[in-house]
Amino acid sequence: MLNFFAAAPKGFEYSLAQELTEFGATEIKESVAGVYFTAPLALAYRITLWTRLASRIVLVIYKGPCESAEQLYNAAYCIDWSAHFSNRNTFSIDFHGTGGFINNTQFGALKIKDAIVDRFRDDGDARPNVARIDADIKIDAHFRNGVITIAMNFSGPSLHQRGYRSTTGEAPLKENLAANMLVRSGWKAAPTTLLDPFCGSGTVLIEAALMAADIAPGLQRSRFGFEHWRRHDKATWHEILEEAKARASLGVKRCDVKFYGSDIDSRLVALAKRNAQNAGVFELIDFKVANALNVEPPAAEGYLITNPPYGERLGSVSELLQLYYQLGDKFKKEFGGWKVAMLCSDIELISALKLKADKQMKMFNGALECAFNLYTLHAQSTRRDTPVLPEGVDIADIAPAFANRIKKNAKQLEKWAKKEGIDSYRLYDADIPEYNVAVDRYLDHIVVQEYMAPASIPEAVTKRRLSDVLLALPAAIGVDPHKITMKTRERQKGTNQYQKLDERKLELITTEYGAKFKLNLTGYLDTGLFLDHRLTRRLVGQKSKGRRVLNLFSYTGSASVHAALGGAKSVTTVDMSNTYLAWAKENFALNDLSGKQYEFVQADCLQWIRDSAHDKSAQYDLIFIDPPTFSNSKRMEDSFDVQRDHVNLLGMLIKLLSPNGEIVFSNNKRKFKMDTDTLVKMKIKVENIDDLTLPMDYKRNPHIHNTWLITHA
């Protein structure tokens, strides 16, 4: 008997142990990401050829305690390597694990390599050569918890590579993962009609057809790890291989299970057909190009097993939620009597199905943790007769309180916005605590920002509520799902607002009281325009005529644009970010503003204020400053806290202010307290002007910001 370890993705251990038991292996023991077992050589060959779940089979040569480099060397040296391979063969070592005396895997691999070549030389043979690529013999070594395991890669390249893929292009679902889906769903135990409406390159259906037609998954592989092993029994292997070929030929002829696959992408369907042809199961599968929402059940009962789209690259969150909701609705209406098994990495999308799972499991698609849910669909005696709203969302079913509130808000604000001369405004701001989001309209686009939920609320609850919000929005306010952008907002920490979210750009031009601004709805947490400061910007513009204006922490320069349009004599725009200064220049260009009177300065604003406060010639008639609540950017010399540091900040700013000048000071700290007593002693006059700067669309959230008018006393 020989000792082996069958490696597999995390979550496969139970299924793999069951498979090995069915093969006839003994001493089966589940471990992390794999299963140990023993088997005679002939059975090991059979397992390697027929396993549908394992990624790799290794022959365990040594396993024992290891507490020093010397012990590691001795463990490898004591093995009779010449019994496993010739010195004419090349070999490589793949070492995993660190700890204790092993600081890095290269050190461990080197020790084992030295032991192997020394053993060959001491036995009177020439040393074998190491080949990092395409070695004849591959040694796998694992060090964990003071135990070293030394093994030989018995199976060769990863077993999920069956050999039927006709391209090395995108293959999001590995073959052994598809096989495990078929096993855990219960389909493999009783094969019946199978449908995959998101078949992609056909992996689930091809793996199922291989099972139903009794075709060994390794039959088309061109290489196995044991081929250069000295104990390889070519005759036994040939016999097992020929038996598998005969079973495959007979199995295809006898297979009476029906397989149906479809995908909306004709290129993927063509690829699926080629893959099925290569796998020898083309005649068993009916492929077609179709939208999953238009696919009809091909039989009265069966299995629908699929890996539907998820992830931002495949569409907006709202679009995907709509898709999943409509799928769930279709399943309930049309697939009574069927079983559904679905793999998805996003709990929000799964919850949008609005189906109760019989069983929920965890699987890994590569490093991506996924939910694998099983559903039993019961035939409905009656169908819902009420009309379905756009995109299949019934507003009465999905978050009715939220839907009704935002619908009411939108109706009230639309007329107001048109009268104001603006096309970007807030529709909803956590009006209902359960739906803890902000919803902003930017022309015909919607941005949803999720606030950080209290720790007391389970994550599953917050995700379900967010899912319901995104599902209800299109019908409630008449917006296309693909024009909804989702963002997650937490309490501002340091430079969070300046962090890039992704490389995509969804850019629009918005209008605000005659000024034009560029928006980027996807690139950053904020869009380039703080909507709550709309009236503050207009106030700056109204106060700017003939004045020297300074805008600090300027962001994208929107207040500077209003100042320039308001007739400012000069405008100086200061920000630490080159990205936002470039954006500010674009905003100036959009408004046909150019000239030497408009200066853009890249600098740490706090340091720039300190330096300028000593320059008596640096005088401004109007200063607008909207500092962050807190900042500790690496590019700034010191941290900044607006509550702690505002007195010192205003004390420096007042030195830059002309005798009749004004400072408009604003910040977003909700519990900010102005230290008026200290400022009065410094001969600084302070007046709160919140009532003048809170727009109608923010009346529901009066503490969104606080604004002050500051002058010389």
Curated annotation (Swiss-Prot):
Keywords: Cytoplasm, Methyltransferase, RNA-binding, rRNA processing, S-adenosyl-L-methionine, Transferase. InterPro entries: 23SrRNA_methyltr_KL, DNA_methylase_N6_adenine_CS, RlmKL-like_Mtase, RlmKL-like_Mtase_CS, RlmL_1st, SAM-dep_methyl-trfase, SAM-dependent_MTases_sf, THUMP_dom. Specifically methylates the guanine in position 2445 (m2G2445) and the guanine in position 2069 (m7G2069) of 23S rRNA. Belongs to the methyltransferase superfamily. RlmKL family. The keyword Hydrolase does not apply. SUPFAM superfamilies: S-adenosyl-L-methionine-dependent methyltransferases. Residues 43-154 form the THUMP domain. It catalyses: guanosine(2445) in 23S rRNA + S-adenosyl-L-methionine = N(2)-methylguanosine(2445) in 23S rRNA + S-adenosyl-L-homocysteine + H(+); guanosine(2069) in 23S rRNA + S-adenosyl-L-methionine = N(2)-methylguanosine(2069) in 23S rRNA + S-adenosyl-L-homocysteine + H(+). GO terms for molecular function: 23S rRNA (guanine(2445)-N(2))-methyltransferase activity; RNA binding; rRNA (guanine-N7-)-methyltransferase activity. GO terms for cellular component: cytoplasm. The gene is rlmL. Coiled coil: none annotated. Its main location: cytoplasm. CDD domains: AdoMet_MTases (cd02440), THUMP_AdoMetMT (cd11715). Its EC number is 2.1.1.173, 2.1.1.264. The lineage of its organism: Bacteria, Pseudomonadati, Pseudomonadota, Gammaproteobacteria, Alteromonadales. This is Ribosomal RNA large subunit methyltransferase K/L. It comes from Shewanella sp. (strain ANA-3). It is found in: Cytoplasm. SMART domains: THUMP.
